[in-house]
Amino acid sequence: MMNSASVRWQLWIVAFGFFMQTLDTTIVNTALPSMAASLNESPLHMHSVIVSYVLTVAVMLPASGWLADRIGVKNIFFAAILLFTLGSLLCARSETLNELLASRVIQGIGGAMMVPVGRLTVMKIVPRDQYMAAMTFVTLPGQIGPLMGPALGGFLVEYASWHWIFLINLPVGIIGALATWFLMPNYTMRTQRFDISGFLWLAVGMATLTLALDGNRSLGIPPIAIFALITVGLIALLSYWLHARRNERALFNLRLFDTHTFSIGLTGGLLARIGSGMLPFMTPLFLQLGMGFSPFHAGLMMVPMVLGNMGMKRIVVQIVNRLGYRRVLIVSTLLLALVTALFALVALMQWIWMIPIVLFFLGMVNAIRFSTMNTLTLKDLPDTLASGGNSLMSMTMQLSTSLGVSIAGILLGMFSQPHMAAGSGETHMVFIYTYLSMIVIIALPALIFNRVPADTIKQSTLPRKS
């Protein structure tokens, strides 16, 4: 594929960055109960550890590409790895939940820049006719990360301590930073002026509203401060809307929403990912606290879901071409709600052998819906708006995951009782009520997807080599 050894090394550097970022998105979930015990917190209130990271990624994503073009991909990628590694070290040294949350924010700033800047690096070092092959190479470790994350996290927690889920990032991060500094050229390009005002309005709006959503229960923020956060958040989002209406170079052009499929895909996708974003957080928590599984056993149970997700992506195009976008989105959404209910039933009935089968099917359905949503959202955008639409969709994906985990944490807190024992009847009831609420949330986007036009253009498939 490549003739130049230096280019090959640069692709390996980007691949390791992808691996670090995607591994971290799943390795933490299995460790939350152990973290809670170590930090003297309730395991049902530990969702903020995930929210702080994912929300930071969502806030920082819009600025990452511009920074790479302006300052250089080498400098930004190097800084991203350093920040991610420093955040990992601080996470491992945290002795309170607040320290851990602050460290996750630092880690999230680095994680937000790694993947988009990595993609930009590949675009600059590889000829266009080799871009797909290069991206396939660098994203493969990114697919292995989520596969390894839950089981590796459970293994480290069970046989070492939760601190090691962050400490394992240190040697990889140091090697990656040194390799970036010595082997990667610092590509730059002329950029337009960055929309600082729009970026700040959106960042403030997303951060304050997400914090207000669960600040009272998980962080003890008083009601008057919650009201102030909601007010500030709504004013910030309204200010961005007014700013974007009169600014053609706004961070995200409002003309994006003139495309009907983009509007439906983005709003439906936001609500859909809130529901499905709960699943990677809730599943290992339910298996450990509700069913009494060990961290490693719970982590292993997550592997079939990732395998189902990876295996289904190859045939999504054929399914959409055969059934159409609207039918695929509606059926997959309702099917995901049904399979989620089936998982809770199978687990509570102690049919342990069926759990990995149901989770594999859950991953398959999730992959169909995700891939179809992403394609629908971007497929009709004009070329001049495609980049902005892709960035907005990426930001919305992270934001909706953050909201989903927050809402799952709120539901657990609403239904929980003090001093519940793992595997007890009271704990089972908490998870039953939470899963019933989740099923409704997961099914709701079907109402939005019902508005998808029936006459969609079929997607082409890549030709197979004979």
Curated annotation (Swiss-Prot):
Domain of life: Bacteria
Pfam hit, one: MFS_1
Keywords (A to Z) from UniProt: Cell inner membrane, Cell membrane, Membrane, Transmembrane, Transmembrane helix, Transport
Cited InterPro entries: EmrB-like, MFS, MFS_dom, MFS_trans_sf, Multi-R_MdtD
Keyword rRNA processing: no
Cell location: Cell inner membrane
CC per GO annotation: plasma membrane
Alphabetized GO MF terms: transmembrane transporter activity
Keyword Transmembrane: yes
Gene3D superfamilies (alphabetical): MFS general substrate transporter like domains, Multidrug resistance protein D
Transmembrane residue ranges: 11-31, 48-68, 71-91, 105-125, 137-157, 164-184, 194-214, 218-238, 262-282, 286-306, 328-347, 351-370, 403-423, 429-449
Membrane topology: Multi-pass membrane protein
Cross-referenced HAMAP family: MFS_MdtD (MF_01577)
UniProt xrefs under NCBIfam families: efflux_EmrB, PRK10504.1
Family: Belongs to the major facilitator superfamily. TCR/Tet family.
Name used for this protein in its record: Putative multidrug resistance protein MdtD
Lineage of producing organism: Bacteria, Pseudomonadati, Pseudomonadota, Gammaproteobacteria, Enterobacterales
